[in-house]
Amino acid sequence: MQKSKAGVFAVAALGLAMTLNTAYAAEYKASTKEGPVKIVNLNDLESQVKANMDKGAFGYIRGGAEDEKNMRDNTASFDRKYIMPRVMQGIELKDIDLSTSFLGIPLATPVIQAPMAAQGLAHRDGEIATAKGMAKAGSVFSLSTYGNKTIEEVAAVSDGHPFFFQLYMSKNNAFNEFTLKRAKESGAKAIILTVDSPVGGWREGDLRNNFQFPLGFANLELFAAQNNDGSKTGKGAGISEIYAQAKQAFTPDDIQYVKKLSGLPVIVKGIQSPEDADRVIEAGADAIWVSNHGGRQLDSGPASFDVLPSIAKVVNKRVPIVFDSGVRRGSHVFKALASGADVVAVGRPVLYGLNLGGAEGVNSVIQQLNKELRINMMLGGTKDINAVKQTRLYSDRDFQ
């Protein structure tokens, strides 16, 4: 029986990816650690990773824009809201239910993984290990356009578990069409359209370290192997050179363009204002992703959590909301859900878990957040995620 065209391409893509991986594997020494990671506090992981990772690579993963005020405030902002302790609610800890759904996909936890580039910096198996770890956690993996593994490689190890593809639109529509077609054929459940990075933020750590990616971006390499257009493919380039190839002049029409090409739901990522939320929903977004890129873009912008309630009010449940930026605690997950998010994404801690334990390390990070979330739900008198979403949070003004 003759193989389908898509099947033949997938096999070819996997073969090329293996060739490319072999070419650079000896040049950059990434972690090969495998196994569960003992975690008391996610904040402890950063120093452990720093001690063992290449300085430039660690700086790229950890760093934020300019003075990193926005990055720090993302986490600090959660302390401006309180969960009111509730008692005598008749709830057993064993009955706390973290399950939920997003875009019709059942999830064991409301915690998902934020798409992040170049995961091969953290671990030899990169995005493949992260995909396996998120699958084990019963959650969703999201692959970046700038990942070190191809869409086909991730699909091959997903084993039916859901994954999303994050698109950094190129100025070259041939690349967009090539990539979205592959995402659809490989089984991606949604496209994350990132719109908050028309240029890279001023990341001083990368500049001081003269950081250039030691590994190629597999999806860019795959396109370049078939279309010699002279584009940078990651290896030997800085982030500003990569972003320079990406589309800058976004318009709402791009949402329909991506939907038409992919035939998949489109999640618009990087929303920070109620006005933009309303605009992209009117343009056809199937979900919005409230995020300031983890403090890596506009340092003078507000904390992501601070803008979430006003955005949720405008969205008014027309589409689901994903939230990220600064999440380090189960209480942060609780507060984001209570402020209008439907699911909550985590970035850097996932990469730290990946570095320290591969797929099992990724799962360890999600399970730590789940443990803390269960305790916060129990003490806050909420039995399930819907109850969390109905919870009122308090601020200092309420006690004056």
Residue ranges and their predicted role:
Residues 1-10:
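Bacterial N-terminal signal peptides that target proteins for export
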Residues 10-19:
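Bacterial N-terminal signal peptides
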Residues 23-25:
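Boundary at the C-terminal end of the N-terminal hydrophobic targeting segment
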Residues 27-103, 203, 210-250, 386-388, ...:
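An N-cap/entry alpha-helix motif that binds or orients negatively charged groups
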Residues 74, 304-311, 354-374:
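C-terminal helical cap(s) of enzyme catalytic domains, especially alpha/beta-barrels
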Residues 106-149:
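Glycine-rich active-site/cofactor-binding loop and its immediate structural neighborhood
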Residues 118, 132, 157, 174-323, ...:
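Alpha/beta enzyme core
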Residues 136-157, 161-176:
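A gly/proline- and charged-residue-enriched helix-loop-helix capping module
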